[in-house]
Amino acid sequence: MADDAVVEEGSVEVSALAAGRPSWSWQRPGERARTPGRKAEDKEWVPVTKLGRLVKDMKIKSLEEIYLYSLPIKESEIIDFFLGSALKDEVLKIMPVQKQTRAGQRTRFKAFVAIGDYNGHVGLGVKCSKEVATAIRGAIILAKLSIIPVRRGYWGNKIGKPHTVPCKVTGRCGSVLVRLIPAPRGTGIVSAPVPKKLLMMAGIDDCYTSARGCTATLGNFAKATFDAISKTYSYLTPDLWKETVFTKSPYQEFTDHLAKTHTRVSVQRTQAAVQPS
């Protein structure tokens, strides 16, 4: 019961916890109010991967270019760079998990966070930590790194913008099996609250769903839905039969630029190390 109380307390002010600050302020009588420190967002992003350097130098123009060449994204700042303020995140659940040790039970908190721009990009992050705030922060970063493109389609005539899933897709995690079925325009999302949140964040307006297994296990339910959404690009439908002409990978295309910037950065680091402090 004590653990549940802690979780409820932690989930009241999610935005404050995720920002790493308490949702309350307290000071002694006569004490001067403390000024908040600089936010992490104010710091300039210094990329540490080749992909990050290309993105910051505007050599890669969109996320779709990264997905086209299946380049792994290792820095969450890349997602912030392209999607920025369009991204919205929501904590699906915070649950206590315990491990039996010789000293007794060790309790940690597990956070499930969904993130998306409501327009074709969605991600899911899971993180376990000693503190609720740290778990939420870590889950948000992992959700950004796991963001996938969502393919949308039509139920009948191709009128207006795509509004539903392009075909029937199935996702699975543990005993949970989630099936997404195209629906007519105006139907809405017919599903349980957890898949509904993920589908809305993915930008799908109309969809029928079918779920089997132990859907009370929220983690598996969310992961199965995310798996189903990721499979929308797995089916090669007739409109994708045209031969794709691939160009060089960005790593090959901008080899000279990467070598130049890498040399410059390494020289700066060497000079900084040589200079007396």
UniProtKB/Swiss-Prot annotation:
Chain residue ranges for the region called Disordered: 18-40
Example of a GO biological process term: translation
Ribosomal protein found in the keyword field: yes
Keyword Nucleus applies: yes
Matching Gene3D superfamilies: 3.30.160.20, 3.30.230.10
UniProt subcellular location: Cytoplasm; Nucleus, Nucleolus
Positions with biased composition (Basic and acidic residues): 29-40
GO terms for cellular component: cytosolic small ribosomal subunit; nucleolus
One Pfam family this sequence matches: Ribosomal_S5_C
Main location per the UniProt record: cytoplasm
Keywords, ordered alphabetically: Cytoplasm, Nucleus, Ribonucleoprotein, Ribosomal protein
A single MF term (Gene Ontology): RNA binding
PANTHER family associated with the record: 40S RIBOSOMAL PROTEIN S2 (PTHR13718:SF4), RIBOSOMAL S SUBUNIT (PTHR13718)
Quaternary structure annotation from Swiss-Prot or TrEMBL: Component of the small ribosomal subunit.
Function description: Component of the ribosome, a large ribonucleoprotein complex responsible for the synthesis of proteins in the cell. The small ribosomal subunit (SSU) binds messenger RNAs (mRNAs) and translates the encoded message by selecting cognate aminoacyl-transfer RNA (tRNA) molecules. The large subunit (LSU) contains the ribosomal catalytic site termed the peptidyl transferase center (PTC), which catalyzes the formation of peptide bonds, thereby polymerizing the amino acids delivered by tRNAs into a polypeptide chain.
Family indicated by similarity: Belongs to the universal ribosomal protein uS5 family.
Protein name: Small ribosomal subunit protein uS5
